[in-house]
Amino acid sequence: MTHLLIVAIGFIIALPAQVFPGEADVTGVEVRQTASRIFHFDVTVRHDDSGWDHYADKWDVLAPDGTVLGIRTLYHPHVDEQPFTRSLSGVEISETISEVSVRAHDSVHAYGGKTVTVALPR
């Protein structure tokens, strides 16, 4: 009986993590230079979108000091497309910056998921 109770409590504790989406994670970043100081980003995001009430709604390109260099708004949930990749072109980045970080945002938790840092090709 004690064993059954422990299993039931474990299931109840673990259930919300599987039923409710967590934070949005960046799982991949590809970047290429398209012109002098201009870059194109292909970013893969993973988030268990549940619909319009909770979904990954944007990702940002950040300088090492935290300055936002580019924002890719995601206009709808990706419930049946996980992970998903979206692009952002025309991101101007100073020659003094050698790497950037990409973070994702969701409509409930804001930021907090996995961030990826990449070196800029020059």
Per-segment meaning from a language model:
Residues G70-E99, R103-A110:
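Short, solvent-exposed, Trp/other aromatic-anchored flexible loops in extracytoplasmic proteins
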Residues Y111-L120:
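Edge beta-strands of extracellular beta-sandwich domains
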Residues G22-D57:
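Short, surface-exposed binding/anchoring microloops in extracellular/periplasmic proteins
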Residues L15-P21:
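Sec/Tat signal peptide C-region and signal peptidase I cleavage site
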Residues V26, I38-H40, P83-S87, E99, ...:
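Intrinsic-disorder/low-complexity, polar/charged segments enriched in Ser/Thr/Lys/Arg/Asp/Glu/Gln
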Residues H3-A14:
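Bacterial N-terminal signal peptides
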Residues K58-L62:
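Beta-strand signatures of extracellular beta-sandwich domains
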